[in-house]
Amino acid sequence: MGQKLGVDSRQKIRQVLGSSSKVQKHDVESIGGGGGEIVPGHSPFDDLPEDCISNIISFTSPRDVCVSASVSKSFAHAVQCDSIWEKFLPSEYESLIPPWRVFSSKKDLYFTLCYDPVLVEDGKKSFWLETASGKKCVLLAAKELWITGGNNPEYWQWIELCESSFEKVPELLNNRSFQMGGSMSTQILSLGTHYSVYIVYKIKDERHGLRDLPIQVGVGFKGQEMPKQFICFDESTDKTKEWPKKKLMKSKKRGDGWMEAEIGDFFNDGGLMGFDEVEVSIVDVTSPNLKCGVMIEGIEFRPKDCQ
């Protein structure tokens, strides 16, 4: 817990809150840029000790900390404190950063982990923090999945892509079967968090067998029944109307040039219910035809409703 507040500090807080029934609101276009403009002139919050302000806002979220910077000059200065931002960093953050990397502050380190993912576990995963909440996000590399025919160069080839987070990604060459899956411990993720899971992929201009092909996908804890739904790597709006009984999750293009489709979700309780390993499944269950032209980056885990 944070530092306890003295009697004088608590009295000042009550005085400030009592004299400021309405605090001007500011929109935050980018959490990394802080809040809006600082309220001009003297603010009653300026009478609070800086360590008191830092202690208060350290119990909020990264988004709220950035917004609070616009309350007054005292708040704007207090939000730079390392003690605040260190609370938002994962406990293992020192092991995630190469020793040659130098950061000017814990705030600088926090936003670096948000916008510059790091490879962990010998390149098996890409790790970063969700900007507004500090929740952990993970992209599991395709090489950590089991892929039917994945080691057969007639069916799949492993290629280098400059836009990939990993050394190589698999490209489907020509195969009638499309089956892949894998599992991951939930210990690397944030506890008490509802996660959405996505398959991240690209389709090539030269492709066949994928158009409007329903792929059955699912996410669930190992040892439990896995809910099923469907995605389509190469979708046309007219054909998918013929799937009234299939729960089709729409794909969308990401800002990094990849495509993604949600394959399921789960709540990470840290294994309290006896399940701490989550499994994913991506299987074509409808077409025996030859297919080619899709590249798989991996499986991404991020807090639900996180963009």
UniProtKB/Swiss-Prot annotation:
It comes from the Eukaryota. Residues 42-88 form the F-box domain. SUPFAM superfamilies: F-box domain. One of its GO terms (molecular function) is carbohydrate binding. SMART domains: FBOX. This is Putative F-box protein PP2-B6. The gene is PP2B6.
